[in-house]
Regions:
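Structured adenosyl-cofactor binding patch, chiefly the S-adenosyl-L-methionine
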Residues: 62, 100-104, 118-131, 189-228
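N-terminal positively charged helical leader segments and presequences
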Residues: 1-55
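Amphipathic alpha-helical repeat scaffolds
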Residues: 3, 89-97, 210-215
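Active-site/ligand-binding-proximal alpha/beta "capping" segment
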Residues: 157-207, 211
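RNA substrate-binding interface of SAM-dependent RNA methyltransferases
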Residues: 69, 75-163
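Structural motif
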Residues: 21-25, 65, 87
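Short glycine-rich anion-binding loops that position phosphate/pyrophosphate groups of nucleotides
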Residues: 4, 24-25, 47, 67-68, ...
């Protein structure tokens, strides 16, 4: 991962294993580097550029251990709110979903089906460090995840443009797991059909749909508000 904000977030969880920094960047991040238990290596600008996946390298890169996250452990704590992204391939949307879930107090984020790697560089940056603050569970079988969530006592709500229930009418005071699919294809039918309800977000303007991040922000905020 790259940049002071992400390295700071990961080091707070004890996940940093090795740090690479240029001579130019080292003085700017002296306090952060001094707090590291991991090995800190000085590297050339050329090496830093090779390690970077951004147009303008930050000069600070860390190798980290992904935090362990297991769905059974998440459910053992009787969560009130979970966000699940299904077939989310765009890293910016995936990272923003993590950030929104963290901001609204969700207990975890689940990525089901063929999703982008949540530790992709763009996804990490979009999460703004929240990926180290909230459990992120990867479950290739999205239908299985829905079944497990319902068995644990959560109502599962699938966001769809043609849902039979309006968000305004949903009972969000109950423990809830939200399902979000990509804007272009939506949720797979075999996954949406397993949910307790298919929910649509009322829209008054000319927009026909919302992307994952926008839909998640609305639905998770509404749930968090009802659960207060």
């Amino acid at each position: 991962m790259e940049g002071a904000h992400l390295v700071e977030a990961a080091s707070g969880r004890g996940l940093v294993r090795e740090v690479f920094v240029t001579e130019v960047a080292a003085p700017r991040h002296a306090a952060l580097l001094d707090r590291q238990d991991a090995t800190v290596n000085l590297v050339t600008e050329r090496a830093a550029k090779a390690l970077s996946d951004t147009v303008t390298p930050a000069g600070l890169v860390a190798v980290c251990e992904p935090p362990a996250a297991d769905l059974d452990d998440v459910l053992a704590d009787k969560p009130a709110l979970i966000a699940a992204g299904v077939h989310i391939s765009e890293p910016g949307n995936a990272g923003t979903l993590i950030r929104i879930a963290d901001a609204t107090g969700a207990a975890a984020v689940i990525f089901g089906g063929h999703c982008v790697d949540p530790y992709n560089g763009k996804c990490l940056r979009a999460s703004a460090g929240s990926i180290f603050s909230i459990p992120v569970v990867i479950e290739p079988d999205a239908a299985k995840a829905v079944t497990v969530l319902r068995a644990a006592g959560l109502q599962v709500l699938a966001t769809t443009v043609d849902g039979e229930m309006s968000l305004d009418d949903a009972d969000l005071a109950r423990p809830t797991a939200w399902l979000f699919g990509p804007e272009s294809q939506g949720l797979p039918a075999n996954v949406a059909d397993l949910a307790d309800h298919r929910v649509h977000i009322p829209m008054r303007g000319g927009a026909e749909s919302l992307n994952v991040a926008a839909a998640a922000a609305i639905c998770l905020y509404q749930s968090a508000r009802s659960l207060r």
